[in-house]
A protein has these predicted regions:
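Catalytic Walker B motif of ABC-type/P-loop ATPase nucleotide-binding domains
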Residues: 129-132
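Conserved ABC transporter NBD signature motif
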Residues: 31-42, 46-47
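Conserved ABC ATPase signature
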Residues: 104-111
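Conserved ABC ATPase "signature" region
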Residues: 71, 75, 82-100
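Helical segment within the ABC ATPase nucleotide-binding domain
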Residues: 144-156
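Hydrophobic anchor residue at the start of the ABC signature
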Residues: 118
């Protein structure tokens, strides 16, 4: 709990494919994967309820506002109606989205899109978080700020698995696999 595990390697090494298999989004040819003791192949829905996943490519809905994206993902992750608005407001506070919550996500700068993607992945308070090259294409300042959010989540006990090909990002990790 609370560790950041890095999967470091060049493009094409299979980092994203490995993540997709561990999250139940791609079927492995063999072996097993368990999330919180739940076999991802036998009970994918239950296993996925314990994890958040931020894809390398944005999974945001550009025609929805920042707030609407958060509300949508809260619904997808099963946050009930009574708690949804409260949780969305908490996320807006945590990520300091107050001034931009009514902007369409397609109009957000890249760094804010990255942060919104992370916010959507953690909206349901998962104990495990998969981040697939979360800072690719973002400027240095946005990368540092993004990693501040990641380390804050780890301090709260969230276990984080992150793929990267940046050596300086690997330094944030408690453990690394090549």
């Amino acid at each position: 709990r609370g560790e950041i595990f890095g999967l470091l390697g060049p493009n094409g090494a299979g980092k994203s494919t490995s993540f997709k298999m561990m999250c139940g989004l791609a079927k492995p040819t063999g072996g097993t994967a368990k999330i919180m003791g739940i076999d991802i192949l036998e009970n994918p829905s239950k296993a996925r309820s314990n994890l958040g996943y931020m894809a390398q490519k944005f999974s945001l809905y550009g025609n929805l506002t920042l707030r609407q994206n958060l509300e949508f993902f809260a619904s997808v992750y099963g946050i009930n109606f009574l708690n949804k608005d409260k949780r969305v407001d908490e996320i807006i506070d945590i990520f300091n989205f107050h001034d931009i919550q009514d902007m369409k996500s397609q109009d957000l700068p890249l760094g804010f899109k990255q942060r919104l993607s992370l916010a959507c992945a953690v909206i349901h308070n998962p104990p495990i978080l998969f981040l697939d090259e979360p800072t690719s294409g973002v400027d240095v300042i946005a990368r540092r700020e993004f990693w501040n959010h990641i380390t804050s989540l780890a301090k709260l006990g969230v276990t984080i698995l992150v793929t990267t090909h940046f050596m300086d990002e690997a330094e944030y990790c408690n453990r690394i696999s090549l």
